[in-house]
UniProtKB/Swiss-Prot annotation:
Sequence positions that bind 3-methyl-2-oxobutanoate: 63-64, 102, 132
Quaternary structure and interacting proteins, as annotated: Homodecamer; pentamer of dimers.
Key words, A-Z: Cytoplasm, Magnesium, Metal-binding, Pantothenate biosynthesis, Transferase
Function, in words: Catalyzes the reversible reaction in which hydroxymethyl group from 5,10-methylenetetrahydrofolate is transferred onto alpha-ketoisovalerate to form ketopantoate.
Necessary cofactors: Mg(2+)
Residues forming the catalytic site: 200 (proton acceptor)
Source lineage: Bacteria, Bacillati, Actinomycetota, Actinomycetes, Mycobacteriales
Subcellular location: Cytoplasm
Enzyme class: transferase
Pfam families per UniProt: Pantoate_transf (PF02548)
Gene Ontology BP term (one): pantothenate biosynthetic process
Metabolic or biological pathway: Cofactor biosynthesis; (R)-pantothenate biosynthesis; (R)-pantoate from 3-methyl-2-oxobutanoate: step 1/2
Superkingdom of this protein's organism: Bacteria
Name of this protein: 3-methyl-2-oxobutanoate hydroxymethyltransferase
Length: 282
C-alpha cells in the first residue's frame, strides 16, 4: 500500500460523498426511483445521534413518547409541553435526518387555526422540519392550511392511536367495506398537500393498492412490505420493550437484556469495591 493510499490521495475506492441534509424532496425522489427507506422514532439527543450516524433518513418524535417515555397507557394524555423538549433534543442530535414532530391529541382537531398555531410553535421552538397529524378527510383542511403556510405535513391514516377509544381498541383498519374510506383518506391528504402518509395496521393488499395510487411516499407500520418506507418505535425495534409487542414488530436487537446486564455488573462491581479502580481515579 502506497503512502498516498494511506493518506487517502490515491485510494482505489471511490471517495464517499458527504452526507446531505434530508429534505422532503429527497423522499419524493426516492419514491420515483423505487428506493425504500426507513423511519424510526427518537425522543432524545443521544439516541437521535446514534440513528443519524446509522444513516436513518427520517426521525419521528412520536406521541408514542406517551407510552415509552412517560409511561401512559395510550398516546391521548401527552401534551405539547411534554413533547417539545424531546423534539429539541432530537433535532440537535440528528444533523442529517429529517425530523418530524407529532402533533398531540387535542392540539389540531378544532380546525385549521388551532393546527397552524400548534405546528408553528413546534417549528419555532424546536427546529423540527415537519409535523405529523392523524386523520384522513376529516383533517384535510388542516393539512391544506399548514401546507399553504409552508409547513410540511406527514399524514397518518388507518389505525390512528389518538382515536383508540373511538375505534374500540387496537384493531386493523380498512377491511371489507371500510377499504374504500381508507383510499378516500389517502387521496384526500395527498390533495391537501401532505408530503407523505403513514398507514398503520392496514391490510397489506390495500396498502399496496394505495401506494400505487399515490404520488407521495407511503410509510407503513403493520401495512405490509410494499409501502415506500417503514417505521417502527425504536424501543420495539431494538428489543427494549418488555412484554408482548404487536404482530408487525420485528426485534433487531436485545437492548433491554444488554442494559440489564450492564447495570447489574456495574452494581456488583461497586458493591465489591472493584469499581472505580485506579485507572478511573485522578
Amino acid at each position: 500500500m502506497s503512502e498516498q493510499t494511506v493518506y487517502g490521495a490515491a485510494s482505489d475506492q471511490p471517495t464517499p460523498k458527504p452526507r446531505v441534509k434530508v429534505r422532503t424532496t429527497h423522499l419524493q425522489k426516492w419514491k420515483a426511483e423505487g428506493h425504500k427507506w426507513a423511519m424510526l422514532t427518537a425522543y432524545d439527543f443521544s439516541t437521535a445521534r446514534a440513528f443519524d450516524d446509522a444513516g436513518i433518513p427520517v426521525l419521528l418524535v412520536g406521541d408514542s413518547a406517551a407510552n415509552v417515555v412517560y409511561g401512559y397507557d395510550t398516546t391521548v394524555p401527552i401534551t405539547i409541553d411534554e413533547l417539545i423538549p424531546l423534539v429539541r433534543g432530537v433535532v440537535r442530535g440528528a444533523p442529517h435526518a429529517l425530523v418530524v414532530a407529532d402533533l398531540p391529541f387535542g392540539s389540531y382537531e378544532e380546525g385549521p387555526r388551532q393546527a397552524l398555531a400548534t405546528a408553528t410553535r413546534f417549528l419555532k421552538e424546536t427546529g423540527a422540519h415537519a409535523v405529523k397529524l392523524e386523520g384522513g378527510e376529516r383533517v384535510a383542511e388542516q393539512i391544506a392550511t399548514l401546507s399553504a403556510a409552508g409547513i410540511p405535513v406527514m399524514a397518518h391514516i388507518g389505525f390512528t392511536p389518538q382515536s383508540v377509544n373511538g375505534l374500540g381498541g387496537f384493531k386493523v383498519q380498512g377491511r371489507g367495506d371500510a377499504a374504500e374510506q381508507t383510499i378516500h383518506d389517502a387521496i384526500a391528504v395527498q390533495e391537501a398537500g401532505a408530503f407523505s402518509v403513514v398507514m398503520e395496521m392496514v391490510p397489506a393488499e390495500l396498502a399496496t393498492q394505495i401506494t400505487g395510487k399515490l404520488t407521495i411516499p407511503t410509510v407503513g407500520i403493520g401495512a405490509g412490505p410494499n409501502c415506500d418506507a417503514q417505521v417502527l418505535v425504536w424501543q420495539d425495534m431494538a428489543g427494549l420493550t418488555s412484554g408482548r409487542t404487536a404482530k408487525f414488530v420485528k426485534r433487531f436487537g436485545d437492548v433491554g437484556a444488554e442494559l440489564r446486564r450492564a447495570a447489574s455488573q456495574y452494581a456488583d462491581e461497586v458493591a465489591a469495591g472493584v469499581f472505580p479502580a485506579e485507572e478511573h481515579s485522578f
